[in-house]
Amino acid sequence: MAGAIIENMSTKKLVILGVILMLFQAFSFMVGGLIAPSPTAAVSYLATKCVDNEKTHHKNPKWFTPWGPDQCSKIKDFDEAMVKKIEANNIVFAIHIPPPNTEMSTWFQFLLLILHFDIAFKIQNQIADGASITIDVRLAYRDDKLSEWTQMAHSVEQRKLSCNFTAAKTIENEGRLYDCDLLPFMELGSVAHKYYLLNVRLPVNERKKVNIGIGEINDMRLVGIHQNGGFTKVWFAMKTFLTPSVLIIMIWYWKRITQMTRPPVLLEKVIFALGISMTFINIPVEWFSVGFDWTWMLLFGDIRQGIFYAMLLSFWIIFCGEHLMDQTERNRFSVYWKQVIPIVFGSFCLFIFDMCERGVQLKNPFYSIWASDVGTELAMAFIIVAGICACLYFLFLCFMVFQVFRNISGKRSCLPAMTKARRLHYEGLIFRFKFLMLVTLACAAMTVIFFIISQVSEGHWLWGGHTVQVNSAFFTGIYGMWNLYVFALMFLYAPSHKRYGDEQSSADQAGNSGEDTQLTTTITHVDGPTEIYKMTGKEAQE
Amino acid sequence: MNFLPNGICFYLSVAICWFSSRVDASWWYMGTLGSQVMCDNIPGLINKQRQLCRQHPKVMQAIGAGIKNWIGECQHQFRTHRWNCNTMAREHNLFGRLLHRSSREAAFVYAISSAGMVYTLTRACSQGELENCSCDPGKKGSSRDAKGAFDWGGCSDHVDHAIKFTQVFIDAKERKERDARALMNLHNNRAGRKAVKRFMNLECKCHGVSGSCNVRTCWLAMADFRQTGDYLRKKYNNAIQVVMNQYGTGFTSAYRMLKRPNKNDLVYFEDSPDYCIWDHESGSVGTGGRVCNRTSRGTDSCEVMCCGRGYDTSRVSRTTKCECKFQWCCAVHCRDCQEEVDVHTCKTQS
């Protein structure tokens, strides 16, 4: 590989660049921690039990509103329904999203609903083993409080009940609630309307065993999760700022490559591809979701993230391979197919899984791959295969890193005996590799640490008088960090434009044919290499 | 308004009762008025409570409807005891004169009623029945509360609002009077509110890229009210008898060897009356006529329940439902079974 900027940069300049990047890093953490609210909000809803007195099943369904001027006729509990001889098929659970005096906003980006049943224990009406609930659900929307509701989705879904009764099953404990698992219910990929309405029925069909053996359902609870509007605004602003930054460095990088007389080497191409994928994930296409009802934004975001991660993992493999100094086969992508296949295959499995889940939800928001046995097995299979590919990749990467370090230590012992040109070349390779290894490990460690913190902590800390949103800081900080990583990579590993010294001709005269393949360029600079560079060279000599 | 003669008699009797006796926690009475809550006609509400009643009529309806819930829980917890949390519908005060005494039972009733109001309001908020739950109306589409705007960072949980409102409403009367009983009620009301909060479960959901835990959202879910009732029942069993300290600002344990009460304990001043005998002065109705369990060894055994006065046995033939098949919600098909059982009831005092 040709000499990169990082080798020729003075220590002073390198430190200045590092400090600037650190300041941007701290700023990106603070934007999330201090300005943005928490990433998501959860609102609890308790379904209202409405009575459908219409006996006919006409084409246009009537919509039952739990509150407001045209609210439905309600029952408080099912003892009341028993007394009035109301049938199960005439009970409609009605949920209005959002709560009174609030409006949904396009800034919320998605709406995820989770279902929980309150089922009371009764000795003579227990939950059968392996029971599943059949749910007939309709979703409607309107954009002002006086409009008619417009149907958006309708589906008949099944969900498996998984309930435990922790107390003894005695008559004294009748009326106590089972401990039931949460059930996935609905996911909308965009929130384009202000008001949503859900009407849910639990139809009973004794002959077909529909909703038989589900126990005594007292209530239906939903939890609505959406992205906070403030977080969305901060996130979009960050993306809008980062896109031109990475784009500019990408253009500059390409100009540097094209200015050279030789064609770009594989590593330079891979770095450029990494910049493209980073820009692709940065482009704030989400701004369109504020104006358009595009439900595929979530899926599109997932795909972009997948592309970036695949490219990043491939870059690490190729970077290691290109720094194996004794390898005669290099600068060709075909050399790395063994290591890249696990990345591609694992990414493909996750892509299929995402299409099976979020892709189907574009048509039917109530679909969940976990609701059926076949779906659960398929999902687990895809996830397991992706996990195996991740492990394989990790082993390959560790092995290659090990090889590079062994190569480095072998080469270091030979450094004093080399000619000056060869020694400078190898020292440059060693410095480049160690620098990137250090920075990559730091970024990966930071990502893992913050992931663990966000799982364990409550989500916000009180710091002085301010509330620090740790989860938001995690998102903006880590996102900013990887952008800075790619930025620094393209800047520092761009080819240097320094002139070659006089040693080139002498190297040609004294070098043998075997070593010539290793020496594509030589490095000279009037300022000399950085202090770190000198120390590594001196250490090698000792 | 034009009252019918029986209406006039009703209000006259209410007025007479109001003047003739002191009324505690008059808001309990709202349940007996049904959905027709008339703030000015509930005896014993102080001005602040009446004002809140007028400002939030739907809240009052929800509270009235929820009274049945916590009374049922109270009666469940004490179903096998001499005092069984019975209410007297014909009295203007639900529990009669029983709560005039600063007893253990009064402490429990105040705590569970406070907890019941929090529970009821939280449910009403989740159903959307109340308008000003956790986001006060501001500009269009930008409702906000102390936590911030709904469309920026979301609003508080419903339970936080319910606790605040319950505290303001229930404690208004006690804060107006500065005597020992008021302090006791304030303490027990707060213990009840904390009991509900104690059983909020933190539930989390992982979502994000491919369902990984890239994003995780948590919320507080309210548990079964029975758990709160069980907890307060344990607190009742371990309630602490206290006296006022010399400054009149707090409590000291009545017996030096016992621990001082903390915020979760129930406190009381006076020993309980003898619930065995009917005593108009203390409000005890006695255990005469109560059904007891001859084979039990607990508090519902005939020996304990009847206070040693003996019991009557009668053979009763009754029709029960058996071999029931349930359909969810609203239908049950059963066979009728005939059986004869012995019913034991306590003798009345002679």
Swiss-Prot record, chain B:
Residues annotated as glycosylated: 132, 293
Xref: SMART domains: WNT1
GO cellular component terms listed in the entry, alphabetical order: extracellular space
Lipid-conjugated positions (O-palmitoleoyl serine): 210
Entry PTM: Palmitoleoylation is required for efficient binding to frizzled receptors. Depalmitoleoylation leads to Wnt signaling pathway inhibition.
InterPro entries, per the entry: Wnt, Wnt2, Wnt_C, Wnt_CS
UniProt keyword annotations, A-Z: Developmental protein, Disulfide bond, Extracellular matrix, Glycoprotein, Lipoprotein, Secreted, Signal, Wnt signaling pathway
Keyword Signal: yes
A GO biological process held by the record: swim bladder development
Signal peptide bounds: 1-25
A Pfam family the protein falls into: wnt
Superkingdom field: Eukaryota
Subcellular location(s) per record: Secreted, Extracellular space, Extracellular matrix; Secreted
Disulphide bonds in the chain: 74-85, 125-133, 135-155, 204-218, 206-213, 276-307, 292-302, 306-346, 322-337, 324-334, 329-330
GO molecular function term, any single one: cytokine activity
Keyword Signal (UniProt): yes
General function of this protein: Ligand for members of the frizzled family of seven transmembrane receptors. Functions in the canonical Wnt signaling pathway that results in activation of transcription factors of the TCF/LEF family.
Assigned protein family: Belongs to the Wnt family.
Protein name: Protein Wnt-2
Organism annotation: Danio rerio
